[in-house]
A protein has these predicted regions:
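N-terminal donor/sugar-recognition subdomains of glycan-related enzymes
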Residues: 1-186
């Protein structure tokens, strides 16, 4: 329990204590982050690394008008279990598409995560895609945070390259189709 009397998540690692919610006013950083995001378009993908401070997800889900897609990657099964005991997801999931990916659960490795994300990211929504790594997660789960960030970056780059390739070759493919159509009739 923090100074304000609210339940918070704190984790000890390497003899250091990490507060995932903050000692004071745990709602304030999430509220400010949500304001900075502004209005989100319909189906905007929002990637969140970690649910140790569920207030970011809560702020996003409760204060976004359009239906968006929220992809949450949690590197700790224990933190995810605590999260499930703390919040009521039903109203958030009625309003938005929320995908939880928890490292350590069966079938939830990074390769399968990549396949899932590939189905969500499109060239059209790349410009409005948002990312958040919950504060202190980069210290607690450094390697996972780097892997998550690289994966998202690589998938975005791949989508841009694929789009540019389609644009470049679409004219050539149309010309080839028309030029070779006469052979199809033979």
């Amino acid at each position: 329990v923090n100074i304000d009397g609210e339940k918070i998540t704190k984790i000890q690692k390497d003899n250091k204590l990490f507060y995932l919610d903050g000692k004071r006013q745990p709602n304030e950083p999430a509220r400010i982050w949500r304001q900075v995001l502004g209005n989100l378009r319909k189906n905007t993908p929002v990637f969140i690394f970690g649910v140790g401070n569920y207030r970011y997800l809560k702020e996003l889900a409760e204060n976004t008008v359009n239906r968006i897609t929220i992809i949450v990657y949690e590197p700790s099964v224990l933190i995810f279990k605590f999260f499930l005991q703390t919040v009521n997801l039903e109203t958030w999931m009625e309003k938005h598409t929320i995908i939880f990916w928890v490292k350590g659960l069966e079938g939830m490795d990074i390769k399968n995560f990549e396949n899932t994300v590939r189905g969500i990211l499109t060239y059209d929504n790349l410009g409005c895609t948002k990312y958040l790594i919950i504060p202190n997660y980069e210290k607690l789960f450094y390697e996972d945070a780097v892997e998550f960030s690289k994966l998202c970056r690589d998938l975005m780059m791949r989508e841009v390259v694929n789009y540019n390739t389609r644009q470049l070759f679409s004219g050539i493919m149309a010309k080839n189709l028309l030029m070779n159509a006469r052979y199809l009739c033979d």
